[in-house]
Amino acid sequence: MNKKSTLNIIDQSYFKKYIANIRPYGFKSLVLCIIDSVFSISAVYSSTIRTLDDFVEHACIKDKHKDEYTCEEFLNNYGDFSGEELANNVFKNRQRTSTVNGILKAQAVKEYIQTFFKNGINTTKDLLSLQDETPIKTQIQRIKGQGSGITFHYVMMLAGDSNRYKRDRQIDEFFQDILGYGKLTNDELTEAFHEQLRIVNEKYPEIDNIRGLDSIIWGYMSERTVRQKQIDKCK
């Protein structure tokens, strides 16, 4: 199967819309990065936004994108809460990390924050300043439901690392099926991302990082899924 170019698949309107609306990505608060990352896996993103907003209201955070809210603050305020209490009263979301023997995502968030804090990571700046992320990533992967490392990469993205992407079903479908790369390992997918970024960047210099391309692909695939559901409904 011949590989295709992202430029031949995604209409130019998606690229132009992204460029016109480039803005700061993610959150200043590491806690919010973790909440977004854990709750967004295998979930409709609108439910993740509601969960974030419920927490922001409960924690009295004024601006969820600009305000600092540290791991220490979370543990001071919610460290004694059980996973059940967090799920029911704070996040108002009882999703689990897996439908088979998964723990509450609320519990996973708490364990994530505890792991970061005991390793001296309190803010996004602390996380992005790590010289070697392997030890902390390994510890995070020991949390039930976090073994793949996907949420860790997404936390890094949300914290400000622009050379990350979030691997999910839509990204896999785009690269493996639509572009024709076939089944890819994590390293191979990263290489494919960089290959497509070079192609896109030649035409759109403003799009110069993996995170930006990930956002464009995600937007395209989300709308494609909606259109397909509408077509299926009319059959």
Show the residue positions of the predicted features.
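Short, exposed beta-strand "edge-strand" segments with a Pro/Gly-rich flavor and a Y/T-containing core
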Residues: 64-68, 74-80, 116-122, 162-167
